[in-house]
Amino acid sequence: SAMTRMIKRKGTEGFSDDIQRVVASFVMSNARMSAKNIYAAQIEKSIQDIESGKSVKDQAYVMKENVFNPKENFAQLRNFLFLWNLGGSIFFGLLNMTQPYMQTLPHLSQYVPIGDATRAILRGSKIAGSAMKNGTAPKGYEAEYNRAVREGVVDPQNVFMLSGVERGKTGASNSAWGVITHTMGLIAQVTESFNRKAVFIAALDVANKKGAVWLKKKGFNSAYDFAKDTVDQTQGVYDKANRSNWANTSVGAPLMVFKQFSINYVEQMVRMWKKEAASGDEGKKAVFLMLAMLASLSGMMGLPFIKDILDVSETTAAFLGNPVNIEREARLALGKDLADPLFNGVLNHFVFNNLGMDIQSRTGMPDLVPWSNALNPTLSAQGRINEFASIGGATGGSIEKGYDASQFIARGNVGMAALTL
């Protein structure tokens, strides 16, 4: 920590020779200490002002300790799962670049017509691309853009990368591994930065068009504040402060890998749906647009909670003596030509499947509640095992893949084992 370094300046063998790690540790520890000194009193006052009851206040104190504690539970495991599932994937990069249209477009459509929101995002994407290519702030946006870069609004991944260097180990092998992991994460890093910069510029344009009076009415002091809020709401905040307390525990951390995106997605829909009509914001229309955008890629069977709803319905029907597979019956009733694009997604069915890609499994979030089908009496033994394993998320999925691969190896089928992994 910064305090330890000030009290006792002592070289540590191996550590002190690793210049990158020393500098990263210096920057991050001082940043944490400075932030704590600046915000600790304000955080304490906010907690003391909570009037929702002792349990809420207790959870707030737990969150405070989680944020102040620099330790990241299972950081290496989460890093491995990212590299294994998404690292170096061009397909993931292209899919990631749909996020401004999947989430930001509906958000901005609350305030301006859909056509205007679309044009703002397209223009923002063009300007952001040029800015990243030239390495300079876009003309006309210099002050806001440079501030957003400085405050980590559009490049938050740099903080996570510095934290990774700080936690790293020394030695040539670890240096080589660091180069590999950095290279594999470049696609995600570049596309994430591009998304945020495009959204930031698009939101600035919308805010400037609406004017200062409108911004004040909505609770924003400036166009910058509105743009920052738009980035946070639609591109996600992935730091420790925005995770549940359970996700910061040793048990919850490995189980919640890759869950934050779906949580952010559902929370955004809830926020928009709760907008009062008197506010002038078309929140409910934005929710339907958001669901339509998702359905175009993942189909009806990829919408949030849809599988959980079907699981509960089918379990209830089975206990009443009328077992049924609702999706299968619906497909039979509609016919293949109509059911496939409707259930699998129009774009997924007509475009991506023909290219050998499956967008539905990457974008859909139908099974958000674990064990929703666990009590179904018609479930097979393997289906029940899979249902209970679903709580493990990406971690459990990797373990399951490893087990399946070992079974193929035991039967001498190394090729299938490799494909399974």
Model-derived features: positions:
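Hydrophobic, often aromatic-rich secondary-structure segments at membrane interfaces
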Residues: 3-343
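Hydrophobic alpha-helical segments
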Residues: 261, 265, 349, 362, 404-421, ...
